[in-house]
Amino acid sequence: MRVYSVTQSRFGVCDVPLVEGQINSREPSILALDSAGLPRRWINLEDAAAYYCRGAVAWDLGDHAFTLHGGVNRASGEQSRLVLRSIVAVRGERGRHRGVAQTPVLLRDMLFARDRMMCAYCGGRFRAADLTAEHVLPQSRGGSNRWANLVSACRPCNHRKGNRTPEEAGMALLYVPYTPSLHEGFILRNRRILADQMAFLMAGVPPHSRLHGPDPAAVGSVHTRV
């Protein structure tokens, strides 16, 4: 098990106050699940610590642990500490999130990550700044702004296709667009995923996902709404 040692404050709900400090923003996030084991959100170490202190963690798992160091007990001379695991299930989350959509929110850079930064028409790989969210069936012709009608396209290919379908433009799609699963969405939106978190999420990714190709951890990025 890999252990991270961090000093942090502002927990409030803890029985023993922790000394002043700051979590490194480059530290990986904690994967928060509901009580049924479904992923719900990425949280920082401070939020995870608050769940532990309130007794709201139903169960946890993972090969990584984060140790938060607190104040020193005057009587014993021992320093308080709180150990967080990299994956935590939060009590009450299942009921609170009933009816939550299983389809990830459509974000431009998550689309590019789904498509592995590859243009659907020429097959080139590009930076996010050089890609566009391209509607297979143009919106002006009734095409929807949904995952299954969007592909990543470089700017020249997008301009060449214009307001036509791929068939009309003579530009065959190199891959088929699809709607990511709930688990896949969590991978696409985080660029700093620990190996145990990745293994947990990949277990819920359907076989047709392109994340089953090489290096799924390389797809994370910063996100902008489409």
List the predicted regions and their residue ranges:
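Short helix-coil boundary/hinge micro-motifs
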Residues: 1-103, 171-226
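Short, flexible, glycine/charge-rich loop motifs used to bind or transfer phosphoryl groups or to couple energy/partner
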Residues: 20, 108-110, 143
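Short coil/turn motifs at beta-sheet boundaries
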Residues: 23, 112, 145-147
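A generic structural motif
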Residues: 36, 144, 157-159
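Short Cys/His-rich Zn2+-coordinating modules
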Residues: 95-107, 133-141
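Short cysteine-rich loop/turn motifs with clustered Cys
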Residues: 103-131, 151-157
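Histidine-centered nuclease catalytic patch
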Residues: 123-152, 161-177
